[in-house]
């Protein structure tokens, strides 16, 4: 619902909110509806028992989000370097370092393309970490997730708002 509220789409999604409290909260809130590029990830299915399988699952999830923004591949606002990076992710030829910094890079590319900062929503961000703890690959997964989340959420000039939800208390 949060993604639907903020995300810029070709269809008018305001119809979903006209009978909700947020619509009655005033023009400041209405003005944000449907105005932002959104990165949305969920790690709800990241329940792998080995680091190799978890890494493949994380890459798959990241690649799917890049595919959701396929319009970037033909963007006149992106550099050849950006498009080469995009292609490496989409073609599954990226390195572990490329994937660790993928969300930071994707947010910068979306910001360039749309001319506005990005909203990032990550659901169950801690599921891969919990699985790493349970199955003995905690060091590998925590290093990956630290870089992935830090690249997009810390000191990112392309970030408008970041929302994380977790499963642990």
Where are these regions (language model features)?
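Phosphate-binding site recognition
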Residues: 1-169
